[in-house]
Amino acid sequence: MEYDIKTLDNGSAGSVALPEEIFAVTPRSDIMARVVHWQLAKRRAGTHRTKGMGEISGTTKKPYRQKGTGSARQGSLRAPQFRTGGVVHGPVVRDHGYDLPKKVRRLGLICALSQKAAEGKLIVLDAANGVTKTREAAAKIKALGWTSALIVDGAVDEQFARAIANLPKIDVLPTIGANVYDILNHDVLVITRAGLEGLKERLA
């Protein structure tokens, strides 16, 4: 697959051959869904927690006698049927993450890359650097027509990352951080030359 290389100034910088085993695979939505669910599960903080019947503050005294009142028998005001009672089988602090085979994760990333290429939403960029001001970055990105873009670079240039930090829906990640969720969550996928080499090594 031959792809034209663009520059940040919307110019041309030659072409590059993209490996078909990474960018021309038939996308599988089931695999990508599994990887996205796995990613989102690992991102969850898991700090949710409720108090059970034994943890609620308050008296443990029986509210009234067992018989003769005409009301249903009650043994504690901490019981879950009361407004101030404990919660039955409530959430506890836990890790929501689970294991996903490395082969599935690798295939999911390849499918996401191939889907962007098939949709014509993959752009190869010469380099993502040389921009230090947000105004300058915004002008260049507007000229390129990107409204939602993920830029994957070999090693993220700090000045460039700061310049685009306040631009909505424009993000940059190093090759090692490229993932299915962020790729699918952006309209355009932009890969630099260095990022392309890094992806080849990572997915070899």
From Swiss-Prot:
GO terms for cellular component: ribonucleoprotein complex; ribosome. Gene3D superfamilies: 3.40.1370.10. GO terms for molecular function: rRNA binding; structural constituent of ribosome. Residues 44-76 are annotated as: Disordered. InterPro entries: Ribosomal_uL4, Ribosomal_uL4-like, Ribosomal_uL4_dom_sf. It comes from the Bacteria. Keywords: Ribonucleoprotein, Ribosomal protein, RNA-binding, rRNA-binding. Pfam families: Ribosomal_L4 (PF00573). One of its GO terms (biological process) is translation. Belongs to the universal ribosomal protein uL4 family. One of the primary rRNA binding proteins, this protein initially binds near the 5'-end of the 23S rRNA. It is important during the early stages of 50S assembly. It makes multiple contacts with different domains of the 23S rRNA in the assembled 50S subunit and ribosome. Part of the 50S ribosomal subunit. This is Large ribosomal subunit protein uL4.
